[in-house]
Amino acid sequence: MENSRIVQKGKDLTKGHQWFQKFSTFFSRIYSTELNPMYNLGGISVLLFAIACISGIYVFIFYNINPRHAWDSVEAMSNNVFNGWMRSIHRYSSDLLVIFILIHLLHTLLTSKFKRLVSWVSGIISFLVVILIGVTGYMLVWDQKAKLTGYLTAKLFSSLPIFDASIAGAFLLNDLDVVGGFFKVALFGHIVFSLVTIIIIWVHVLRISKPKIFPPKKLVYYVIIALDIIAIAFPVKSDPPAQASNLPISTTFDWYYYFGYYLMKLFSVNTNWLILIGSGVVLSIIPYLIKRKNNPPAFIDLDKCNACNLCAYDCPYEAIDMLQVEGKRKAILDPDKCVGCAICIGSCDEHAITHPMFPDLVVMPKPKSDVTVFSCSYFPEPELPSELNIQRYRVPCTGSIMPKDVQRMLENNTEKVAILSCEDCYYRLGKTWTINRFLRKRAPLFSKKFDASLVQLLTLTQYSKEKLLAFSKETVSEEGGSGEINIGDHKKGNPVWSVLIMTLFFALMIPLSSTTVRFFNPAEKTLIVNFKYISSPTEYEQFGSGAAHMQVKNPAVKRRSPVTLKIFSSKDKKLIFEKEYEPRGLRHDIAMFIFTQLVVDEDAVDVVLTETAFPDKQYKLDNIKLKQGDGTFVILRDDKLIVADKQGF
């Protein structure tokens, strides 16, 4: 037996793509390779986004944008069978969108496809924008979860100079005069960010030829049916309205959108900013952190190019354009876009394209081998049957195999040809183009003069040396004929099981979308002092000349007095808290926001607000009873300190 000759150029490639296919083949057996959800992660993500948008438009028809009536309108919607079903579809499609984006991101990392910088960065941005869409959407319900969202968001931004911490207190107090503006911003952001996402998706696939925007039609049906089932079986419910209590003690928590907010429970605000910015930067620069040498680009001999346009049409990454060169139309390759897949070699009947990693094929007459094996660079080292005389070539992608070369091999030096391919092509289209060429559906066609049944394609998860041996021993019909290529792949799925498994997967995500999380301890006594205060002026700025008749009657305030907030125990008058607040503005001449949030062990406290420059001007409220759970709010109303109720009065 002649030893197998392996022609391999370049370095070994990542094992991540191989591992992912071995994991995903379970779903191929049920769905088929074409409909495998793991091979359509991006398409399913776009589909879920489209479903969320369509259902969101419908839900918006019945939504009252006034925050005082928002919860009631959502509740009325939920109490209607069809409207409630549409709301559930909107909610679950949004949650699943995050899940599939994350799986898509992990798949990209695992298979080292993040080197395409534009696609990677736009993907990261789209994930962040989707999170913003979800958070603003939850705000619009204006239930206890919305109140908690507003409070945590305001608390996070309070560390920035242009935001004040008192906004967090306004959310807790349900002060719609203050937070009503933020409510409108949330509504505006929810709509605008959705439109921005469409642009980001376009950028994401900008440099990809023939992108799969949506999954195959049957898979679309499976997703919609599964989504409909869980929306009917598990209708979405709101938390109690925001006005129901001051502190959102116990709220449902959607981990898919709120995972970042949980860090507010564990770390300080500044630490959360470091985590937020740091993780965003690290994700964005992963293509630079993890070095992976790309395949060299292909080379086109313009003297041989006959301008057939097939290479430009077949390139998965739009790296080839047909341009005028010295008055003649030629194929011009952009090396910055080329990933070195060499699929263009399989497109060129004129052998005008070469690649450093493509082997030198023996097509001339010689003693025939039993099987000639082509394996793609992402196919693991195959175990070959020792009893066969095998000629083996390793190519960058099976899409680089030219039908004309296979014809010459079958004619001159081999009995049969086996092609070992990825189940899901690393370069997207290589496997598809190869099959279609040998099925005579895509140029360059495999000639009808040759029997295509002498060629077999086996995917990574289908290959075994026993199958290769059986293929080599298969007899060919003596009647002749063009035959058809043998394809070892998962071609047929089970629609019923496909829908059931997808429904089960969708249902398993529901618990994480509505777990109960507490950011406030119901056993603690929380005191919150929150109000706007304009202190007395300490300096004035006089405009005009020194003449009395030139002076203005109401001079401008140049500076105002700071104030000091003190909190004492009503029992023993022990000082619990003291803080000085400065008026805002560059000249300290603008109103200030008084805000503090304390957990106090006392049963009652006294609150005293004193103007530093005018000690006689003082506001005092004694013997404020503190209660567990819902908290106690002290506000300034009608020029006196009072304890607010749940409605902010």
Q: What is each model feature region?
A:
Residues 612-640:
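Structured interaction patches on ligand/partner-binding surfaces of diverse proteins
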Residues 317, 530-570:
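Short extracytoplasmic
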